[in-house]
């Protein structure tokens, strides 16, 4: 066997049907497009969601909800991430400096995920009840 003699197994590659090559081909004349109408024409397509003039689904359904402008700048931090930080005072600036939160973050919430093994002081961050209990159990404190 040589690289220049490689070829697919017999019958594994079926050649595609050619369009518009006579009645006997099965795809002659109209070439699988049917008779008349927009989609039979060259360049004729209908936009996604078009239902033939009937009110389309995306217009029948009501609008609801909105995108929170605060959510874009809010982040969550796990206790395990705080534990890995070298500083004793945890605030927004310390988290940004350690690249734990995005530089654009304006609000950070500490959540109970992982463990904290040392005493830290959390300043100016939102903290869940479970996370607050875990921080206090480790000898730390939470300040507003």
From Swiss-Prot:
UniProt region (Disordered), positions on chain: 1-60
Gene3D superfamilies recorded: 3.100.10.10
SS bond list: none
Domain of life: Bacteria
GO biological process, one term: translation
GO cellular component, one term: cytosolic large ribosomal subunit
Keyword list, A-Z: Ribonucleoprotein, Ribosomal protein, RNA-binding, rRNA-binding
Feature: compositional bias, Gly residues: 21-31
HAMAP family cross-referenced by the UniProt entry: Ribosomal_uL15 (MF_01341)
PANTHER family, per database record: 50S RIBOSOMAL PROTEIN L15 (PTHR12934), LARGE RIBOSOMAL SUBUNIT PROTEIN UL15M (PTHR12934:SF11)
Role: Binds to the 23S rRNA.
Subunit structure: Part of the 50S ribosomal subunit.
Similarity comment text for this entry: Belongs to the universal ribosomal protein uL15 family.
Protein name: Large ribosomal subunit protein uL15
């Amino acid at each position: 066997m040589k690289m220049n003699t490689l070829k697919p197994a017999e019958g594994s590659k079926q050649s595609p049907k050619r369009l518009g090559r006579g009645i006997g081909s099965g795809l002659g004349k109209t070439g699988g497009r049917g008779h008349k109408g927009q989609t039979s024409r060259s360049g004729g397509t209908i936009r996604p969601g078009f239902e033939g003039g009937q009110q389309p689904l995306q217009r029948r359904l009501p609008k609801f909800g909105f995108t929170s402008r605060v959510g874009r700048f809010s982040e969550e931090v796990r206790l395990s991430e705080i534990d890995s930080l070298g500083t004793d005072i945890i605030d927004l600036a310390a988290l940004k400096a350690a690249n734990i939160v995005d530089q654009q973050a304006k609000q950070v919430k500490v959540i109970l995920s992982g463990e904290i093994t040392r005493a830290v002081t959390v300043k100016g961050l939102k903290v869940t009840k479970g996370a607050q209990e875990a921080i206090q159990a480790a000898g730390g404190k939470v300040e507003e």
